[in-house]
Amino acid sequence: MGCWQQLHLPVPLRGVLSVPFRAFGIRPSRMNPNTCTICELMFTTVMRARKVSTDATVLFADLRGYTTLSQSLSPDAVSALLDAFYDECAGAIWEYDGLLNKTIGDAVMAVFNFPIRSEDHTRHAVRAARQIQRRWQVARKTLAESLSLDGGDLGVGIGIHCGELSFGEFGRSHRDLTAIGTVVNTASRAQSAAGADQILVTQEVYRRARSDLAGSEAKAY
């Protein structure tokens, strides 16, 4: 697997063939191990420009029931629960070329179409959301057994919206590289309205990813 988009070369990121590239500092990115460090250079551009406007899709996923559960669990158990949740979300997001932008308590925020560009970024976000649900269904059974919990208390609610947003470094005393704008706020509201094990998408997401959402219903937020 390589980073075709930036270098237009099939750069191997793993195995013996990756050794020569690693000598030049080209290795799997910390943002997404399926991309290389060349992609990280895009963030340098963003930092210098302060912000970049781009069409993108934002996904929020939240672990339902976490606040109540955390009050009855040991710190180690809470840590294990969050680590497992973050890992399953990250794997699904990276599989569809998304950027895991933030982990916020019991929630994650992902951006699709930055820095890895794709015309199908909205479809990718929808597929990543479904993959998160599938992966978590399996993981939470194991967690429920090991932590003596009711697996039904560990559902995930997901919200998705797409459109123009600003990506850059914001803040004065504490600078934060992230996406902001109406798209982000709307995706967050959709996630808040989603029930456990539910994915809510907006009308614009439905319009762009209709073929992946057959039988689904869009809602206004």
Model regions and ranges:
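Catalytic core of nucleotidyl cyclases, primarily class III adenylyl/guanylyl cyclases
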Residues: A92-H124, V138-T182
